[in-house]
Amino acid sequence: MTRHFLRDDDLTPEEQAEVLALAAALKKDPFSRRPLEGPRGVAVIFEKNSTRTRFSFEMGIAQLGGHAVVVDGRSTQLGREETLEDTGAVLSRYVDAIVWRTFAQERLTAMASGASVPIVNALSDEFHPCQVLADLQTLIERKGSLKGLRLAYFGDGANNMAHSLMLGGVTAGVDVTIAAPRGFEPHPMFIAAAETRAHQTGATVAVIDDPLRAADGADVLVTDTWTSMGQENDGLDRVRPFRPFQVNADLLGRADSEAVVLHCLPAHRGHEITDEVIDGPRSAVWDEAENRLHAQKALLVWLLERS
């Protein structure tokens, strides 16, 4: 049976732990696994602009012995002159996996229904699951264990990072609090999914509008841009509600004395996070960015071995 990774809860807690353990091993010995030797091909499709995702996937596929066939979604006929199901079926005859950065989650689901090779969500409007695998790998490196950690996210609770942190975090046994202004809460459907998974792992998930309370005693502070792709023209009216949710020295001072700060990047310095924090001793942002490479390699190896 072909396995896909379209959202964070596509992996069980045990499977997620396997991927993270493999990511750690591949970080120590980058060329120890070569499942794409040949080279075999992986389609890497970008309908949204990308820096970290493109570099990390292209290099990761090369280190696994494969060849990345990178295409701009605008130069293909994805979903225009044939169904996404048909495209998935056709691409499966050419490549061994498909990595896709797209818009609506439904597009991934549609292609996966026709594909016979693994599909990886490299970012959608609803989820950013590869990033959260890298976040979890970083926290294991910094904290040693994930279970029982208190993670607080500050900013737009309706964006893909908030959704993925909820689902991926509680899968790992992390207690997740989303601190967001009123009107910017996570989608109720994804809150419910996170609560279901949290019940299985013993973790907790909460959504509040008080950033100070969320920061109190937290082990991990996470933020993301206040303006996601496609919202750049919304102006000051969009930014204003988020200002109390900035991750700055005062907010960090309320967290645990050994708290770690994460940001998936790109960072809008002076908006969601200050220079003092992102460049400070408790920032793990650069390790987090590097771990995209290792976590995604581990994910591809894991999926290919099971499909």
From Swiss-Prot:
User: One GO cellular component from the entry?
Assistant: cytoplasm
Q: What is its EC number?
A: 2.1.3.3
**Catalytic activity from the UniProt record:** carbamoyl phosphate + L-ornithine = L-citrulline + phosphate + H(+)
Where it sits in the cell: the answer is:
Cytoplasm
Q: Which InterPro entries match?
A: Asp/Orn_carbamoyltranf_P-bd, Asp/Orn_carbamoylTrfase, Asp/Orn_carbamoylTrfase_sf, Asp_carbamoyltransf_Asp/Orn-bd, Orn/put_carbamltrans, OTCase_ArgI
Q: What is an example of a GO molecular function annotated in this UniProt entry? A: ornithine carbamoyltransferase activity
Which keywords describe this protein according to UniProt? Amino-acid biosynthesis, Arginine biosynthesis, Cytoplasm, Transferase
Q: In which pathway does it act?
A: Amino-acid biosynthesis; L-arginine biosynthesis; L-arginine from L-ornithine and carbamoyl phosphate: step 1/3
Taxonomic superkingdom? Bacteria
Which sites bind carbamoyl phosphate? S50, T51, R52, T53, Q77, R101, H128, P129, C130, Q131, C264, L265, R292
Q: Name one GO biological process term.
A: L-arginine biosynthetic process
Residues bound to L-ornithine: N160, D224, S228, M229
Give the family this protein belongs to, as stated in its UniProt record.
Answer: Belongs to the aspartate/ornithine carbamoyltransferase superfamily. OTCase family.
According to UniProt, the name of this protein is Ornithine carbamoyltransferase
Please tell me the species this chain comes from.
Answer: Mycolicibacterium gilvum (strain PYR-GCK)
Give the classification, highest ranks: Bacteria, Bacillati, Actinomycetota, Actinomycetes, Mycobacteriales
